[in-house]
Swiss-Prot record:
Native species: Arabidopsis thaliana
Main location: plastid
Function per UniProt: May play a role in embryogenesis.
Transmembrane segments: none
Protein name: Pentatricopeptide repeat-containing protein At3g18110, chloroplastic
Lineage: Eukaryota, Viridiplantae, Streptophyta, Embryophyta, Tracheophyta
C-alpha cells in the first residue's frame, strides 16, 4: 500500500498545507532551528502600503538589506493569524503617542520624557539588547532578574516588540515577560500587548493559554478589534471556524465592528476547517462585500492558498478572475499561489506562463516562486526543465534550500532513480550545509519503500532519530507501507508499535495499512484487536478493509464478530443495507449479503444502479451466477418497474467484468435498451467505454448512435472516447465533426489530446492538408497550438514524406515557440527517412547542432533504425561506433536491432562479436536475439552452432517460444533429420505452442526426401483434420513426394483433394502430376494430362511437354519422345533448356553409342547442336561457345543452367570425355553455376561440398579436388587440418545418390575416407592418412583427367540402386555386397574388387570363417574370465 496523497504527494511544495497540525508544529521547530535568521516579510501588511490615502507612516524604517525569502511554499506563506497580528501591530504604532506610561522605578540610565522615548532612534538596539539578554538565560534563571535590573529604559511599545521578538524563539520566555509586566503593574494590559502575546501563543499552538489570557483581558480591552483579531488568529491556526465565528458575533454584540483583517482571519479559519467546496470562495467573498468591506490581496491570497492546498484548479481560476474583475492588484503571493496550484494540477505550461507574466508585471520572483515552478516541472518528471529552472534560480542568487532539495529528491523518487535521490540527500547534508528535515526523510523513506529497499529505508529512519528529528506520522506510515509492500509483516508491526511508543497517534491511514497487513497475513485475531482500537479512536476502515475483515472472519467462522462488524458499518459508518450488502458480497459472505439486500428492498429502499452493479459484479467475479439470477428474480418481483434498470444493470455488470460479448448480446437482444425504449446514459457510456477499452470500435460507434438517438446528452468523456474511436476506424473527418459539435454545446477542449489524435489520424490517411486545416482553425479561434499539436502536425507531414513542410513547422516553433523538443527533432528526421533521403540525414543533424540542439540518443537510434531498415550495414556500424564514442551506452533495444540486422545480412562474425559485447555489458541476451542467431545459423547451414545456441537458451533459463521451435524444426529438416524435428514439434505442442504452416511444410518435405512417406502423409492428414486452409504449395509438396515414390494414384487423389478444397490447379500442378506418371513408368497417362491441358484455354509452355517427353525417354521409348518433340515444334513452341536437359540426361544414361547419337541428332534437327558437336571430336574448340551458352542459361530461372550443366557433365563422364568435362565444370564455376568453394585446398581448410551436383559432375569435382590435395601433400603447403570433410548429402539427383556414387569411387581406390559416425551425408578422412594415401597409392599416380581417343561404343557408367558406378566394377560390387553386406572398409573393398571372381569367393569365405572363429574365441575367453572370477572369490572364503 502507498502512503496517502495528502501525506506524501507534494512534500516539497507545501509543508504546512499537506501535514496535520502536529506535523506543522514539528516543521515549525525544524524551521526555527535551521533557518532562524531567515524571516519572511510581507510589504502589503504595512498600513502605509495598504491604505496610502491615509498618509500613514511606520514608526521605524524598513531594513535596507535584502530580505531573504522563506523556505516554505506559497501556501505556507498564506497570511494567517500571526501575520494579522503583525499587521495590527503596525497600525497600533500610530497610537503610541496617546498611551500613558506606567509607573517606573527610579533607576534609569537616562531620564527621558514620553515624547523623547517615542522619538528615540535607538529603540531597535534596546529591543535587541533586552531580547538577547532574556534568550541567553539558562533554564534555572528567570526573566524577572533581567527586567528588574532595569538595564535599559523601555516604553510600552518597546515591551510589545520584546514580547514578539522573544516569542519567535520561546513562547515560555515571552509569557514570562508578559506576566512580569502584569505582576509589576509596569503598565496596564493594553490591546497591543494582549494582541502580541496572543499572536505568540497562537504560533506555538498554545491555545488553552491564549484563551485564558484573552478571557482575563477581555473586560479591559475587549472592545478593541485587534484583540479579537489576534484571538481569531489562534483559532484559525487550528481550523476552529466555529470558535472564530463566535468571536465575530461577540464583537458585533459589543459594538466592535469587524474590519477586513477580521474577515480575512475568519476566512482562513473556515478554509482550514475543511476543504474548499464548490462556490465556497464566491460565498466568502460575498460575505466580505456584504459587510461593506472590499476584499484585498490578503483575502484573495488566502482563498488561492486553500485552492492550492486542495489542488482545486477551477476554484483558483474563479478566485483569480474575480480578483482581476474587481481590480484588486495581484501581488507576488498571488502569483506564487497560482503557480503552485497549476503545478499541483499538472499544468506546468500554465505555471511557466504565469511565471513569465509575473516578471513582465514588474515583480521579482523569490525562492517560493522558483520552488513552486520547480515543483511543477518535477511533478511532470521533466528533468530538463527542472535543471533549467534551478540554473535560473541560481543566477538570481537563490541557492538550494530545503524545499528545493525536497522537490528534486521527490522527483527522482517518483522516477525510480533512487540512487540520484540518495546522492542529492548526501549533497544536501555535506556540500550545501542544509539540514534535511522531516519531509526530506519522509520522501526518501517512502520512495525506498515503494522500491522494496526497506533496509535502506529503515536505516534512514534510524539516522533521522540520531540527528534528533522526530519522525512524523507520515514518516511512520511510509515505512509501514514499505514493509507492507515487501511482505515484511513483522517489521511493519514493530514499526507500528514504535510509533505508538513514541506518542504519535495513528491516523486513519496508519490504522488502515496495519489492518491490511494483518488481514492479508491471515492474522485475523490481531487485526480484530487493532480494529477495535481504531474504532475507539474515532476512525473507521474503508469498504475494502471491511471486505478483507469479513473475509478473514468468514474463514475462521467467527459469526458473532461478523455481526458486530455489520452493526459497526451501520451505526458508525452510516452504511445503508445496500452498501452493507455490497461489502458482504465482496467479503464472500453471500447469505448475509442477500439478506441485507432483501431487507433494503423490503424496507422501500430504491434500487440504485451503482449499488446493484456492485453486488452483481461481486457475484459474477466469485462465479456464483445462480445466486445472481435468483437475486434478479427477487428484484423483478419486489422492485416494481425495474425491468429496464435490471437489464441495464446486467449490461453494465458484464462490462465491469469485461465480458463485452455478453453485454453486447444483452444489449442488442432487449428492445427495452436497444430500440425505441431508450436506456440510461450510464448504461450507454459504460458500454461504450468498454467497447473502446476492448478495441471494438464498430460496436462503440453503434452504441454512440443509439445514445444520440435516445436524446441523451453525450458527456465530455464520451466525446473524447468517440474521437478516439473514429480516429482508430480511420474516419478523422467524423472525429473532427464530433469535436465541433461538442464545442458548440459548451465543452472546451483547448489544445487537448483529441486534436492531436485527429491530426495523427489525418496523417495516417495521408491527408496532411486536412491536418494542416485543424491547426489553422485552432489558431484562428485564438487557441495557441501547444507542443503536442505542433509535433502531431509534423508527424502528419512525416507520414506523407513532406520533409519541407515539417521543416517549416520546425522553424515556426523555433521562431514563435514552443521550443522544439527531442520528439520534434525525431519527427523531423523521420520525415526525411520516409521521403527516402537518408543521405541527407547527416546534413540535417549538423544544421541542428549548429542551432544549439544536442542530438539525443533517441535521434541517433532513429537514424540507425532507418539505415537498418534499408539494410545498410556499413552506415549502421558507423553510427553505432560514433554513438559509443560520444558516450551513449547501447541499450537492449539497440543491441537487438543491430544483431537482427547483422543476422539478416549473414554477418556471422559481427553478430557473434555483438552478442559477446552485450554479455560483457551485463545485458541479458533476450530470446528474440537468440532467435535471430538461430535463423542466421540455419540460413548458412551451420547446424552445429544452431544447436549450441539452443543449448545456451536453455542454460540461461529462457523459455523457447514459437519462433525458436519453428526455426529448430526447419534446421532439422534441412539437416535431413526430420525425426528429431518431429519430436521437437511434439514437445512444442505439449507446451501449448502451435507450429507455423511453413514448419509443417518443411517437415513434410523433409520426410519425403528421406522416403518416410507414412510420416509425411500423417502430417498432411493431420493438417486437413484440423480444418486448416492449406495453400497450393502443400499439395505440390505432397505431389512431389508421390512423384518420387512412383505412386501416380496418390498424385491423382491429391489433385482431386486440391480441387475439392477450392484451389484451382496451375500449370505447375499438372506438371507435377505428369512427372508422377513418368516416375511410375506411365508416359501415356502423362500424355493424356497434356491433351486435357490443350483442350483448356491455358497458355502452354515447354514445361508440360518436357514432362511428357521425359516420361518417354525414362522408359527408353526414344522414338516416342522424339515424336512429341517434333509435335511441339509443329505447334509453334520453340524447344528451350528444359527439352535440351531432358535429351542430354537421357543420353547420359543410354547404354549404347547409337542411342546417344539418336537423341543428340534429334536436338541437332531442332537447332541445338552443341552436345553432339562436343562428342564428335575436338571439343576444345568450343570453349567460348559453351561459355556463351552458360551465360545465357544463368539468367534463366528454375535452375536452368545448373540442370543443363549437370546433365552435360554426366554425359561427358559416361562416354569418357573427362578432360572436356573438367573444363566444362570449371566454366560452370566461373559463371557462378557451381559454388566457388565447391572444394577447397587452403591453409588448414581442406574440404568439399558436392551437394547440388550430378553424379558425373561430382566425379569430376572429386578428381580435381584429389589432384589439388595431392599437390599440397607433395609441396607441404597449404597445410591441412586435422581431418578433411567431404559433404555428399543424402538426397538423390535424378535417381543418382551422391553419397553412394562417391563411396563406390573412393572405396574402389582404397581411400581413407570413412562415413561420419554422427551425421549422415558426410565422409571424413584423417589428414595424415589422406596425405600418405595421395602420395603412395597407385590409384593416385595419375589423377589427370583425359579424353578418350575415340568415343566408346557403350556407356562406361551404370546406375545400380542409385549408385552411378563404373560398369566394369558392377559384378564385383554386387558380389561383395551380396556376400558381406553391411559396411566394408575401403581398403578391403579395393583389395577384393581387384581379385578374379573365384579367388574373391575364396577370400570372402576365409574372411567369414575367420570372423566366426574370432567371435567364438572371444566368447570362450569371456566365459573363462567369469569362471576365474568365481574361483577368486572362493579363495578368500573362510572355512568353518
Amino acid at each position: 500500500m502507498a502512503v496517502s496523497a495528502g501525506a506524501l504527494a507534494f512534500p516539497a511544495l507545501s509543508v504546512r498545507a499537506t501535514l496535520n497540525p502536529e506535523i506543522k508544529d514539528e516543521q515549525a521547530n525544524i524551521s526555527s532551528t535551521t533557518s532562524s535568521s531567515q524571516k519572511f516579510t510581507y510589504s502589503r501588511a504595512s498600513p502605509a502600503v495598504r491604505w496610502p490615502h491615509l498618509n500613514l507612516r511606520e514608526i521605524y524604517d524598513s531594513t535596507p538589506s535584502q530580505t531573504l525569502s522563506s523556505p516554505v511554499s506559497p501556501i505556507a506563506g498564506t497570511p494567517d493569524s500571526g501575520d494579522v497580528v503583525d499587521s495590527i501591530a503596525s497600525r497600533e504604532e500610530q497610537k503610541t503617542k496617546d498611551e500613558t506610561a506606567v509607573a517606573t522605578r527610579r533607576r534609569r540610565v537616562k531620564k527621558m520624557n514620553k515624547v523623547a522615548l517615542i522619538k528615540a532612534k535607538d529603540w531597535r538596539e534596546r529591543v535587541k539588547f533586552l531580547t538577547d539578554k532574556i534568550l541567553s538565560l539558562k533554564s534555572n534563571q528567570f526573566v524577572a532578574d533581567i527586567l528588574d535590573a532595569r538595564l535599559v529604559q523601555m516604553t510600552p511599545t518597546d515591551y510589545c516588540f520584546v514580547v514578539k521578538s522573544v516569542g519567535q524563539e520561546s513562547w515560555q520566555r515571552a509569557l514570562e515577560v508578559f506576566e512580569w509586566l502584569n505582576l509589576r503593574h509596569w503598565h496596564s494590559p493594553n490591546a497591543r500587548m494582549v494582541a502580541a502575546i496572543l499572536g505568540v501563543l497562537g504560533r506555538w499552538n498554545q491555545e488553552s493559554l491564549a484563551v485564558e489570557i484573552f478571557t482575563r483581558a477581555e473586560p479591559t480591552v475587549g472592545d478593541r478589534v485587534q484583540v479579537y483579531n489576534a484571538m481569531m488568529g489562534v483559532y484559525s491556526r487550528s481550523g476552529k471556524f466555529s470558535k472564530a465565528q463566535e468571536l465575530v458575533d461577540a464583537m458585533r454584540q459589543r459594538g466592535c465592528v469587524p474590519d477586513l483583517i477580521s474577515f480575512n482571519t475568519l476566512i482562513n479559519a473556515r478554509l482550514k476547517s475543511g476543504g474548499l467546496t464548490p462556490n465556497l470562495a464566491v460565498e466568502l467573498l460575498d460575505m466580505v462585500r456584504n459587510s461593506g468591506l472590499r476584499p484585498d490581496a490578503i483575502t484573495y491570497n488566502t482563498l488561492l492558498s486553500a485552492c492550492s492546498r486542495d489542488s482545486n484548479l477551477d476554484g483558483a481560476v474563479k478566485v483569480f478572475e474575480d480578483m482581476e474583475a474587481h481590480r484588486c492588484q495581484p501581488d507576488l503571493w498571488t502569483y506564487n499561489a497560482m503557480i503552485s496550484v497549476y503545478g499541483r494540477c499538472g499544468l506546468a505550461a500554465e505555471a511557466e506562463r504565469l511565471f513569465m507574466e509575473l516578471e513582465l508585471k514588474g515583480f521579482f520572483p523569490d525562492a517560493v516562486t522558483y520552488n513552486s515552478l520547480l515543483y511543477a516541472f518535477a511533478r511532470e518528471r521533466n528533468t530538463e526543465k527542472v535543471k533549467e529552472v534551478y540554473q535560473q534560480m541560481q543566477k538570481m542568487g537563490f541557492g538550494k534550500d530545503e524545499m528545493t532539495y525536497n522537490t528534486i529528491i521527490h522527483m527522482y523518487g517518483k522516477q525510480g532513480q533512487l540512487d540520484l535521490a540518495l546522492q542529492l540527500y548526501k549533497d544536501m547534508k555535506g556540500l550545501s550545509g542544509r539540514n534535511p528535515d522531516a519531509i526530506t526523510y519522509t520522501v526518501l523513506i517512502d520512495s525506498l519503500g515503494k522500491a522494496n529497499r526497506t533496509v535502506e529505508a529503515a536505516a534512514l529512519m534510524s539516522e533521522m532519530l540520531d540527528v534528533g528529528i522526530k519522525p512524523t506520522l507520515q514518516t511512520y506510515s511510509a515505512l509501514i507501507c514499505g514493509y507492507a509492500k515487501a511482505g515484511k509483516r513483522e517489521e511493519a508491526e514493530d514499526t507500528f508499535s514504535c510509533m505508538l511508543r513514541s506518542g504519535t497517534k495513528p491516523d486513519n491511514l496508519a490504522y488502515s495499512v496495519m489492518l491490511d497487513v494483518l488481514l492479508r497475513g491471515n492474522e485475523t485475531r490481531k487485526a480484530w484487536g487493532l480494529y477495535r482500537d481504531m474504532i475507539s479512536d474515532g476512525h473507521t476502515p474503508s469498504y475494502t478493509l471491511y471486505e478483507l475483515m469479513i473475509l478473514g472472519l468468514m474463514k475462521e467462522n467467527r459469526s458473532d464478530d461478523i455481526q458486530k462488524t455489520i452493526r459497526d458499518m451501520e451505526e458508525l459508518c452510516g452504511m445503508n443495507p445496500l452498501e452493507i450488502s455490497s461489502v458482504l458480497v465482496k467479503g464472500e459472505c453471500f447469505d448475509l449479503a442477500a439478506r441485507q439486500l432483501k431487507v433494503a428492498i423490503t424496507n422501500g429502499y430504491e434500487l440504485e444502479n451503482d449499488t446493484l452493479l456492485s453486488i452483481l459484479g461481486s457475484y459474477s467475479s466469485s462465479g456464483r451466477h445462480s445466486e445472481a439470477f435468483e437475486l434478479l428474480e427477487f428484484l423483478k418481483e419486489h422492485a416494481s418497474g425495474s425491468k429496464r434498470l435490471i437489464t441495464e444493470a446486467l449490461i453494465v455488470l458484464h462490462c465491469k467484468v469485461n465480458n463485452l460479448s455478453a453485454a453486447l448480446d444483452e444489449y442488442f437482444a432487449d428492445p427495452c435498451v436497444h430500440g425505441w425504449c431508450f436506456g440510461s446514459s450510464t448504461m450507454y457510456e459504460t458500454l461504450l467505454h468498454c467497447c473502446v477499452a476492448n478495441e471494438h470500435y464498430a460496436e462503440a460507434s453503434q452504441v454512440f448512435s443509439d445514445l444520440r438517438l435516445s436524446g441523451c446528452e453525450a458527456s465530455e468523456s464520451v466525446c473524447k472516447s468517440m474521437v478516439v474511436v473514429y480516429c482508430k476506424l480511420g474516419f478523422p473527418e467524423t472525429a473532427h465533426q464530433v469535436v465541433n459539435q461538442a464545442e458548440t454545446k459548451g465543452f472546451h477542449f483547448a489544445c487537448s489530446p483529441m486534436y492531436t489524435d485527429i491530426i495523427e489520424a489525418y496523417g495516417k490517411q495521408k491527408l496532411w492538408q486536412k491536418a494542416e486545416s485543424v491547426v489553422g482553425n485552432l489558431r484562428q479561434s485564438g487557441r495557441t497550438p501547444d507542443l503536442k499539436t505542433w509535433n502531431s502536425l509534423m508527424s502528419a507531414y512525416a507520414q506523407c514524406g513532406c520533409y519541407e513542410r515539417a521543416r517549416a513547422i520546425f522553424n515556426t516553433m523555433m521562431r514563435d515557440g514552443p521550443s522544439p523538443t527531442v520528439e520534434s527533432i525525431n519527427i523531423l528526421l523521420h520525415a526525411l527517412c520516409v521521403d527516402g533521403r537518408l543521405e541527407e540525414l547527416y546534413v540535417v543533424v549538423e544544421e541542428l547542432q549548429d542551432m544549439g540542439f544536442k542530438i539525443s540518443k533517441s535521434s541517433i537510434l532513429l537514424m540507425l533504425d532507418a539505415f537498418a531498415r534499408a539494410g545498410n550495414i556499413f552506415e549502421v556500424k558507423k553510427i553505432y561506433s560514433s554513438m559509443k564514442a560520444a558516450g551513449y551506452l547501447p541499450t537492449i533495444r539497440l543491441y537487438r536491432m543491430m544483431i537482427e540486422l547483422l543476422c539478416k545480412g549473414k554477418r556471422v562474425r559481427d553478430a557473434e562479436i555483438m552478442v559477446s559485447e552485450m554479455e560483457e555489458a551485463n545485458f541479458k541476451v533476450e530470446l528474440a536475439i537468440w532467435n535471430s542467431m538461430l535463423k542466421m545459423y540455419t540460413a548458412i547451414e551451420d547446424y552445429k552452432k544452431t544447436v549450441q545456441v539452443y543449448q545456451r537458451i536453455k542454460e540461461t533459463g529462457l523459455e523457447p517460444d514459437e519462433t525458436t521451435y519453428n526455426t529448430l524444426i526447419i534446421m532439422y529438416c534441412r539437416d535431413r533429420r526430420p525425426e528429431e524435428g518431429y519430436l521437437l514439434m511434439q514437445q512444442m505442442r505439449n507446451l501449448g505452442l502451435d507450429p507455423k504452416l511453413d514448419t509443417y511444410k518443411s517437415l513434410i518435405s523433409a520426410f519425403g526426401k528421406q522416403k518416410c512417406l507414412e510420416q509425411a502423409e500423417q502430417l498432411f492428414e493431420e493438417l486437413l483434420s484440423k480444418g486448416l486452409k492449406l495453400d497450393r504449395s502443400f499439395y505440390h509438396t505432397m505431389m512431389k513426394i508421390s512423384r518420387d515414390s512412383g505412386s501416380d494414384s496418390k498424385a491423382e487423389k491429391l489433385l482431386q483433394m486440391m480441387k475439392n478444397a477450392g484451389i484451382e490447379p496451375t500449370l505447375a500442378t499438372m506438371h507435377l502430376l505428369m512427372v508422377s506418371y513418368s516416375s511410375s513408368g506411365n508416359p501415356q497417362e502423362a500424355e493424356k494430362v497434356l491433351s486435357n491441358l490443350k483442350d483448356t484455354e491455358v497458355e502452354l509452355t515447354t514445361l508440360p511437354y518436357s514432362s511428357v517427353i521425359d516420361a518417354y525417354l525414362r522408359s527408353k521409348d526414344y522414338n516416342s519422345g522424339i515424336e512429341r518433340l517434333l509435335e511441339m515444334k509443329k505447334e509453334g513452341l520453340e524447344p528451350d533448356h528444359r527439352i535440351w536437359t531432358c535429351f542430354v540426361r537421357a543420353a547420359s544414361f543410354s547404354k549404347e553409342k547409337i542411342e546417344v547419337m539418336l537423341l543428340l541428332k534429334a536436338l541437332e534437327d531442332i537447332g541445338f547442336d552443341l552436345p553432339i558437336r562436343l562428342l564428335a571430336g575436338r571439343p576444345e574448340l568450343l570453349v567460348s561457345e559453351v561459355d556463351g551458352w552458360f551465360e545465357k542459361l544463368k539468367s534463366i530461372e528454375d535452375n536452368a543452367a545448373l540442370n543443363f550443366v549437370n546433365a552435360l557433365l554426366n554425359l561427358l563422364w559416361a562416354f569418357e570425355l573427362r578432360a572436356t568435362a573438367s573444363w566444362v565444370f570449371q566454366l560452370g564455376i566461373k559463371r557462378g553455376i557451381f559454388s566457388l568453394d565447391v572444394f577447397r585446398v587452403a591453409d588448414k581448410d581442406w574440404g568439399a561440398d558436392f551437394r547440388r551436383l550430378s553424379g558425373g559432375a561430382a566425379l569430376v569435382a572429386l578428381t580435381l579436388w584429389l589432384d589439388h590435395m595431392q599437390d599440397a601433400s607433395l609441396e607441404g603447403y597449404p597445410e591441412s587440418p586435422k581431418s578433411v570433410v567431404l559433404i555428399t548429402g543424402t538426397a538423390e539427383y535424378n535417381g543418382i545418390s551422391l553419397d553412394k556414387t562417391l563411396k563406390a569411387c573412393l572405396w574402389e581406390m582404397g581411400s581413407p575416407f570413412l562415413p561420419c559416425k554422427t551425421r549422415t551425408g558426410l565422409l571424413v578422412a584423417k589428414a595424415h592418412s589422406l596425405r600418405m594415401w595421395l602420395k603412395d597409392s597407385p590409384f593416385c599416380f595419375d589423377l589427370e583427367l583425359k579424353d578418350s581417343v575415340s568415343l566408346p561404343e557403350s556407356n562406361s557408367m551404370d546406375l545400380i540402386d542409385g549408385c552411378f558406378i563404373r560398369r566394369g566394377l558392377v559384378p564385383a560390387f554386387n558380389h561383395i555386397k551380396e556376400r558381406l553386406g553391411g559396411f566394408v572398409s575401403p581398403k578391403k573393398f579395393s583389395r577384393l574388387a581387384l581379385l578374379p571372381d573365384e579367388m574373391r569367393e575364396r577370400v570372402i569365405k576365409t574372411d567369414i570363417e575367420g570372423h566366426r572363429q574370432k567371435l567364438e574365441k572371444m566368447k570362450k575367453k569371456k566365459m573363462g574370465n567369469e569362471t576365474n572370477g568365481i574361483n577368486t572369490r572362493r579363495k578368500f572364503v573362510r572355512s568353518k
